[in-house]
Amino acid sequence: MARLLQASCLLSLLLAGFVPQSRGQEKSKMDCHGGMSSTIYEYGALTIDGEEYIPFKQYAGKYVLFVNVASYUGLTGQYIELNALQEELAPFGLVILGFPCNQFGKQEPGENSEILPTLKYVRPGGGFVPNFQLFEKGDVNGEKEQKFYTFLKNSCPPTSELLGTSDRLFWEPMKVHDIRWNFEKFLVGPDGTPIMRWHHRTTVSNVKMDILSYMRRQAALGVKRK
């Protein structure tokens, strides 16, 4: 009887979308396609206060980590880790860019003007201020997705076979390369081409190790060419 009750509870959680998908259906990281004819430098975005349009070509020569963020997500704590990552790897040429989005569980419901105060006083709270650039809230999937996210998604295979629970995903049409949840990450290289894509549940510490490993390989190749 106890086992039956336990199984019933687990099924209810699965149907509600609170239990993670099988690890066999997802990968922590995917390498992006090579030989892309265009780069991220063809795009740009408005800062979260709406006062400045930043062309991404401004980051030429840098490694750029694109992250779709949300203030009321179970992964919002990653903000603190991303701050640490930005501080630690900035000397090696890493720039983190955050893009608030409300398409996953409606977990970024506020206006642009409310996002920074929410981060400071609510989640993560404790006076938290991101040390990386945040941009205006927008879509990363669907009919109104931002064009640079179309480019990133088409450049890199998805990390999971399944999109997730449809009643918690708010866009149409749904496509195989779509972002699965808040805090999915894309790394773009110094030449503007996408390199890696990470599953949202991949820890920031693992993302850091992957980035450092790639940087070391590139540095070694540079030495060999000399």
Curated annotation (Swiss-Prot):
GO molecular function, one term: glutathione peroxidase activity
Tissue spec: Secreted in plasma.
Enzyme category, top tier: oxidoreductase
Recorded GO CC terms: extracellular space
Catalytic residues as annotated in Swiss-Prot or TrEMBL: 73
Subcellular location as annotated: Secreted
Record key words, sorted: Oxidoreductase, Peroxidase, Secreted, Selenocysteine, Signal
Catalytic activity: 2 glutathione + H2O2 = glutathione disulfide + 2 H2O; tert-butyl hydroperoxide + 2 glutathione = tert-butanol + glutathione disulfide + H2O
Gene Ontology biological process: hydrogen peroxide catabolic process; response to oxidative stress
SUPFAM superfamilies hit by this protein: Thioredoxin-like
Keyword Endoplasmic reticulum: no
EC number(s) from the headed UniProt entry: 1.11.1.9
Keyword set includes Nucleotide-binding: no
Leader peptide range in chain numbering: 1-24
Subunit structure: Homotetramer.
Function comment: Protects cells and enzymes from oxidative damage, by catalyzing the reduction of hydrogen peroxide, lipid peroxides and organic hydroperoxide, by glutathione.
Stated family: Belongs to the glutathione peroxidase family.
Name by which UniProt lists this protein: Glutathione peroxidase 3
UniProt source species: Hylobates lar (Lar gibbon)
Gene behind this protein: GPX3
